[in-house]
């Protein structure tokens, strides 16, 4: 049996037919077994689905090996050949979810084979820290939170896991995905939970299914231990204990989960190696394949070509026969090496989101876009690519429009004017943010404490109150801060710099908030004129104070300033 177990293939259980295990040998011979349960398998086999309708084979996942029991998730379509289990994508309506586990002896077990998918929206998508189990609405926020775990120890994390209790479940990660997607036109989505690792690329994700539990304010949402809440504490409530906030990041072996194939041609999928060399080659393939443009016309559906399904004007393409991973392609792609027929072969699929006007979703931060070209341009912000450089100061930008806006700093141009107060701004977003100071609008709301903010950047900084993240560290004393501005102000304590001066008494301060508090002293006494020194050395503020009899100038003397 060990010599034959190269792949384990699940056939689609359409019309109530039971799933069947298949062993694929090195020469391509497929041996079938009537049952899955109890079969011996390799340490890291690859699971497949084949559909009875067209014979297409799909690579769904490899088993993870994070604990004694290995687990993978299988999206089972009903009445069709489209299926996927990826970030933010709906499963086919009426689909069932099968969970296959492998015990320490390598025996396959099936549980919840026909568990129905809950009808939920994309709002159920969340990102879970694999160290402390905290939940976050965006992957970028999770990655920022996980920096706080880098100095911990694995033993401490194991203690917290023991306190948390509950059923442990292995994680299947998605490597090499450019844009996880499902081509189902209409469908319902389950509560899919994303688990990320710093060792993965931003586009790589882990997918697991888990029921979400309500957190209690008086207990740590991670380990369940009681927390002492300060009754007079202002701001958001603390949701995690100090021990969990200092837990370390643990290494977790990640396996592969790819977008399900969509096609009417049988195409066996090969096992993809997880060695560094193989993964580097896969990343090169992904980078090379995603540099094209959106196709504008359909290819012929003749011999040697994939069928084309035109959904709308905003499309992407996906090759079933290149590298066996189902990686999404953009633009035209030659398949002469596959079919022996030259030319372009395109298979179009559409990313579906909950917003019909913005069907393209960023799988890193959750941003929505109306065009794929906008999404592609947006992802440069995450990759760090900056091809547009200022010829004056040398700063580089990810988009041409960012460079254009930056150039106004040098030219002094401020074309955007507030209709209420007349203030002018160099960029349109700055004007919109300013206008909210007049309207009182606060459209950016924190999902934890429901506090609203006028600017998205302010909300982003506010979230660190809940995550406990303090990524900005003083190199002199080691103090850490949640915001760069706080570190900048703190650095003035060491340098002695006090750039903020009072225009009334010339007192200097390190930050503008201290200056603002100081000005309140002058406002309390009605002081508006610059100070002077009297003959006896006391500080004198000259001010015109109206009197009932006359309006002569009077001197207000304040000692000690």
From Swiss-Prot:
InterPro entries from the UniProt entry: Znf_C2H2_sf (IPR036236), Znf_C2H2_type (IPR013087)
GO annotations of cellular component type: chromatin; chromosome; histone locus body; nucleus
Sorted UniProt keywords: Chromosome, Developmental protein, Metal-binding, Nucleus, Repeat, Transcription, Transcription regulation, Zinc, Zinc-finger
Effect of deleting the gene: Lethality; females die at the third instar larval stage, while almost all males die at earlier developmental stages.
Region Disordered, annotated ranges: 290-315
Gene3D superfamilies: Classic Zinc Finger
Intracellular or extracellular location(s): Nucleus; Chromosome
GO molecular function per UniProt: chromatin binding; chromatin-protein adaptor activity; DNA binding; DNA-binding transcription activator activity, RNA polymerase II-specific; DNA-binding transcription factor activity, RNA polymerase II-specific; RNA polymerase II transcription regulatory region sequence-specific DNA binding; zinc ion binding
Main location class: nucleus
Chain intervals annotated as zinc finger (C2H2-type): 127-149, 360-382, 388-410, 416-438, 444-466, 472-494, 500-522
Nucleotide-binding found in the keyword field: no
One matching Pfam family: zf-C2H2
Function text: Transcription factor involved in X-chromosome dosage compensation in males, the process by which transcription of the single X chromosome in the male is elevated. Binds to the DNA sequence (GA)n. Clamp-binding promotes nucleosome depletion and chromatin accessibility, thereby allowing access to other transcription factors.
Subunit composition and interactions: Homodimer. Interacts with msl-2; promoting recruitment of the male-specific lethal (MSL) histone acetyltransferase complex to chromatin. Interacts with Nelf-A. Interacts with NELF-B.
Protein name, per record: Transcription factor Clamp
Organism per entry: Drosophila melanogaster (Fruit fly)
Gene designation per UniProt: Clamp
